[in-house]
Amino acid sequence: PILHLRMGAGPVKILMWSQMHGDESTATAALMDFIHLLCRQTEYNFNDWQTRFTIDIVPMLNADGAAKQTRVNGQFIDINRDALVLQSPEGRVLQHLVSSLQPDLALNLHDQNAYHGISERQHTSTIAMLAPVADHAKHITPVRKQAMQLICAAQKVLREYIPNHVARFDDTFSPRSFGDNIVSQGVSTILIESGTFINDPHRQVARKMNVLTYFTLLDALLHNKYEHYTIEDYFAIPEHQDDVYVDLKLTDLLIANTDHPFTIDITINVDKHGSTNIEHIGDCHTVKGFKELSLSGYQLISDYQDLQPDSAANLIFVSPSGLLITINELLST
């Protein structure tokens, strides 16, 4: 079933949904925290929120995908590419909510790739936000401008807790995606993408920052704490980049068993099944590893021809002390 929860009975209507992709659960946990704290009414000065806001929440839009930990639903459809044709029941439910509720603000909650970062600073993109566009020209409509201003208000607070880890998500127009489609229907929409933080594989920092973001947005709406922000302030937020991070970065490996010895770096990622894969070979100084190790003095025992991008990292090295070491052992050190 798709569960829909309503809180409050105020004039400002907010629609929030999470886990449109079944394997993206960070915001679902954050929504449970948010509901709990909002009902307690002790941590935040929101005693009159019930008369100011009507908050509609769908905590798990893609229950079938969540059960299987897959991005797609039970039909193998990516719900977030179904906004135009509405062939998925989940997509139809979401569109019905948008059409019937006509929210003042829609929050589209996702997880982002673990390797996204802020390239010029080589920091993880723990929270990335976006005011989606409604067309290829990326016109700044009144509802998009409001989303931009609200994002500015939220990121100002977030930077007090996770400086250098707040980013602006890519705004390429995607007409099949719900965020862009909902903006085109005249609804102010914010995409919130939860990412990683150093030594936080389960994204608990992003979970906490989501909750803080939700309350900050409510506070900004309640007390008009966003209207002074400009479009320039929004675009000053650093844009996140792909492939800034890898799981393991190995540097200074000398390839000596050749007519012309050379030194390389190797980057490796681990997929959700635990398999290790080679990403890059060569100069990798622009990429940062969640774990970084120098292999100066090590020797590669594996055939160098096995060392190819997009191949399994079934590599064996000899340490300076003569020990045989595998990639998995390097990951666990």
Identify the role of each PLM range.
Residues 11-15, 20, 25-164:
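Active-site/substrate-binding loop(s) of hydrolase catalytic cores
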Residues 129-333:
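C-terminal accessory segments enriched in acidic
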Residues 7-9, 321:
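Feature targets compositionally biased, intrinsically disordered low-complexity regions
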Residues 8, 61, 193:
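Residues at the C-termini of beta-strands that transition into short coil/loop
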